[in-house]
Amino acid sequence: MGIQGGSVLFGLLLILAVFCHSGHSLQCYSCPNPTADCKTAVNCSSGFDACLITKAGLRVYNQCWKFEHCTFNEVTTRLKESELTYHCCKKDLCNINEQLENGGTSLSEKTVLLLVTPFLAAAWSLHP
């Protein structure tokens, strides 16, 4: 098998990698009603690529979530809660209560930091 054969083999492997997937779905803790001690693990449906844990007062929500919806506005709207803390993650069974209790940061805090940093850098460079 020369260079051309190697290219064909590489092309076939690439096509297989694109069209085949492991079939593994994300596992999250998910309970139908808010509870502080959710231990029910579920395989998330297709399209749900994140786990969410949310604390609103004494209510704790655990569920599969779309990572693109991991914003404060989306979470408050979908859960119909006005004040809450939340944590989105993309690893199996990562939405445990300790994420919030140990100071897990919300996506919105990280986003604000990422948005503010360039403005601070620009202001610093303009300062005489």
Curated annotation (Swiss-Prot):
UniProt keyword Cell membrane present: yes
BP GO terms, sorted: negative regulation of activation of membrane attack complex; regulation of complement-dependent cytotoxicity
SMART domains: LU (SM00134)
One GO MF term: complement binding
Ranges where the UPAR/Ly6 domain occurs: 26-108
Keyword Membrane in annotation: yes
Signal sequence interval, chain numbering: 1-25
Keyword list, A-Z: Cell membrane, Disulfide bond, Glycoprotein, GPI-anchor, Lipoprotein, Membrane, Secreted, Signal
Disulfide bridges in this chain: C28-C51, C31-C38, C44-C64, C70-C88, C89-C94
Name by which UniProt lists this protein: CD59 glycoprotein
Gene: CD59
